[in-house]
């Protein structure tokens, strides 16, 4: 599933081609996604794009009369095409732009979403989200306050969008390794120093992944079709049985709620 760095990479990739250009029309080949493509998107015509923003894992296209909310789901991706190239089986949505470019949405599993709203504030998919992990609001003090009475393991708690948005499975595993914290530790057991460190390394890991264009494991390419390169720097995720890059101990893989967790028994306490 694309996580925050992959979505931010998409935002940065498509923004220069959309902002200042006009959507001539939308071509919806298959509107049966996680939720049906909103009727307003079918009717788009001669509509300028004012900005391309991101909230959590949602891409937000600002238009004069409302917003398109895009979620990539499990396997979705966006590409900028220089012209109207023939569509393939899983190419479900095109935005045809006045500058000759095409924004093409591809989603083999069709678990993404293209929604429309007049106002972002209060929209049900955005209403209950925690702070952005790269914001000043997300820091050690905030994390300690939220963890203090939480009797659940720290890894699934980090992946809860009510705590902080966009820290998915890959980056939760990588951040906990960087902080030396075992994923099964109770959130309430973290010290002030550990919360400070964890907040800092989450920011560092996410920023580094964004710089590398995200992590390409199976489905996610960048908006230009190229892979993300952070996978080459992964310390624990997807490395079951391989030696820890720090101590040489074999990386362990377990499952919690059907999600894989990777860690080093020696480095993480």
Swiss-Prot record:
Its cofactor is Zn(2+). Monomer. CDD domains: EcFpg-like_N. Transmembrane segments: none annotated. Its EC number is 3.2.2.23, 4.2.99.18. DNA binds at residues 90, 109, 150. It catalyses: Hydrolysis of DNA containing ring-opened 7-methylguanine residues, releasing 2,6-diamino-4-hydroxy-5-(N-methyl)formamidopyrimidine; 2'-deoxyribonucleotide-(2'-deoxyribose 5'-phosphate)-2'-deoxyribonucleotide-DNA = a 3'-end 2'-deoxyribonucleotide-(2,3-dehydro-2,3-deoxyribose 5'-phosphate)-DNA + a 5'-end 5'-phospho-2'-deoxyribonucleoside-DNA + H(+). It comes from the Bacteria. Binds 1 zinc ion per subunit. Involved in base excision repair of DNA damaged by oxidation or by mutagenic agents. Acts as a DNA glycosylase that recognizes and removes damaged bases. Has a preference for oxidized purines, such as 7,8-dihydro-8-oxoguanine (8-oxoG). Has AP (apurinic/apyrimidinic) lyase activity and introduces nicks in the DNA strand. Cleaves the DNA backbone by beta-delta elimination to generate a single-strand break at the site of the removed base with both 3'- and 5'-phosphates. One of its GO terms (biological process) is base-excision repair. The gene is mutM. GO terms for molecular function: 8-oxo-7,8-dihydroguanine DNA N-glycosylase activity; class I DNA-(apurinic or apyrimidinic site) endonuclease activity; damaged DNA binding; zinc ion binding. Keywords: DNA damage, DNA repair, DNA-binding, Glycosidase, Hydrolase, Lyase, Metal-binding, Multifunctional enzyme, Zinc, Zinc-finger. Belongs to the FPG family. This is Formamidopyrimidine-DNA glycosylase. A zinc finger (FPG-type) spans 235-269. The active site is at 2 (schiff-base intermediate with dna), 3 (proton donor), 57 (proton donor), 259 (proton donor).
């Amino acid at each position: 599933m694309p996580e925050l760095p992959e979505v931010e990479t998409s935002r940065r990739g498509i923004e220069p081609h959309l902002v200042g250009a006009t959507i001539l029309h939308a071509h919806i080949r298959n509107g049966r996604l996680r939720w049906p493509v909103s009727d307003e998107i079918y009717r788009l015509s001669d509509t300028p794009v004012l900005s391309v923003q991101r909230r959590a894992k949602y891409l937000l296209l600002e238009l004069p009369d409302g917003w398109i909310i895009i979620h990539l789901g499990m396997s979705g991706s966006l590409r900028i095409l220089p012209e109207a190239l023939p569509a393939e089986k899983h190419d479900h949505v095109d935005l045809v732009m006045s500058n000759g470019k095409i924004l093409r949405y591809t989603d083999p599993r069709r678990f993404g979403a293209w929604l429309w709203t007049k106002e972002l504030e209060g929209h049900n998919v955005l209403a209950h989200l925690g702070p952005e992990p790269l914001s000043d609001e997300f820091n050690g003090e905030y994390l300690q306050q939220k963890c203090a009475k939480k009797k659940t393991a720290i890894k699934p708690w980090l992946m809860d969008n009510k705590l902080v948005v966009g820290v998915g499975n890959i980056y939760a595993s990588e951040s906990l390794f960087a902080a030396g914290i075992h994923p099964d530790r109770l959130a309430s057991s973290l010290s002030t120093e550990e919360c400070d460190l964890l907040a800092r390394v989450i920011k560092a890991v996410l920023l580094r992944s964004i710089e590398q264009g995200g992590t390409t494991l199976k489905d996610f390419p960048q908006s230009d079709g190229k892979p993300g390169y952070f996978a080459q720097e992964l310390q624990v995720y997807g490395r079951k049985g391989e030696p820890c890059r720090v101590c040489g101990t074999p990386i362990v893989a377990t499952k919690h709620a059907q999600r894989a967790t990777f860690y080093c028994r020696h480095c993480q306490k």
